[in-house]
């Protein structure tokens, strides 16, 4: 029944062929997050919660987009998208427990608010850096496409987030690869307090789609029917014809960035203008005017939702404070796996270091049909060092993928593939270039298992090292950037045998692995290597020489410098330990050796301050001090960038100082 008094609404609605039931469902779906927020704001004022990021005024976007997706399609929301979580029907007690840091949440108290993810509800939570999740959406969509699943992925960002380089990279990759992603921009006028006029110069953000050859649509983000109808139509089309689509939703944030910051920077008349466009009150008036929503039904919705909120809040408040031990926390940093050992067979062939890596890659590709290789120039060209030469012909372009120069987003793609249960290897053309992808490695891959029990089954190959006259941007050995980041594993083999076996182990491991390959060893070191597929466990150093007078602990090229230098000390009895993996580190073998010899020299190609060598030295002093007959000595490169000229590079590297340093230790 229509009301006697005509109601006003400031949004033009077109219900089309939508049923009354669908219209009421959309209204109720928007009402639920609004009422939850109303309650949260009360609790905030009462001091019962510490912080709240409001999405009031933006409910139509989260609810409309989520309602247009199928339940098994992934969605990557932001911190204002409460409607995504409620529309996916996450039980409220679990949501409230999550916000309270309780055990019935999704992250064991390790993540707050909306940063968590859940495979059960196909939601992948954001990280505070905003941009990386765009690349992750690309990866999920790529997995759908490779598996020939007619599914789409939706990812949210704000107009402020579009200023990040990750936004460009993710859109670029999605357009080049025709990935079925809906890039949803919530343009709410302000990035915290920065207005759009100071954020970008284009008139509309959808104009950016032109540069990527990408279909783009601008949608009234406060009009639930426009959001739901248009996104439903686009989603259905993209499922049949995979491609990325850029969506700009025009809306407004009616509360502060978070409640403490307020909205004083917003002109009062602007707040008043957008208040008249409230998505819920306008839609309510429309439904009432159309005779679809009665006062009784509306009251019923309110009462049901409020009762659900209060009941589940009480459950969350009554839940005990989460209990965890140091062991519990440490055990969840990495995905626990049972190492699978594959024995090498007697048949061997002499391989260069580079060929052993290539052979390991090839055999792993044959073993794991869901393994995807990605990197610049790795397909037809075979990679900068020709390690993947011939792979394209054997495994096809779907699995051996040239990438744009978009390191950050490609690492995000690898993460997305892992979320879909696939494996990924990313080749950095040079390890120096990993700086362009540093953020997703240390903030996404490294933390995701600890945050919500989602492994990052990703290997990043890192051609590294000096001694090849490549200068400051193609010669770094930057393993220490990653060994100090919990959640990452770091491998650094010195020999062909180890390189192949450890690479196979890295690919089997569901945790993120940085696999360092020294360029100077690629074609200079040869060794007999088993022809079959085999693995070598992480965390086990190799004792290359056994002695009683001095311990030399090193890895990578340092192993070969030590072997060469020891030829000048034929009478010296030396323990030479090749670490092989730096995270996990074989501290047991280090301590056994040092306690036996009483003297230790640690060699690293890195400069010393903050290096792996420095950490090993500290561990030795803490655990073996009473066994030492001399200070634990370290030898590393100069504290300068890496020079290009041959004589300067030789001066920079520690190799030419090794003889003198060893004498110093012997004579102490």
Segment roles from a protein language model:
Residues 35-38, 42-177, 195-201, 206, ...:
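Cofactor-binding active-site loop characterized by glycine-rich and histidine/acidic residues
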Residues 42-48, 113-127, 151-154, 189, ...:
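Glycine/charged-rich beta-loop-alpha catalytic/anionic-binding loops adjacent to active sites
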Residues 51-58, 79-80, 116-134, 158, ...:
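Active-site nucleophile and cofactor-binding loops and adjacent substrate-binding regions
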Residues 63-71, 140-149, 171-179, 210-211, ...:
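Alpha-helix C-terminal capping segments
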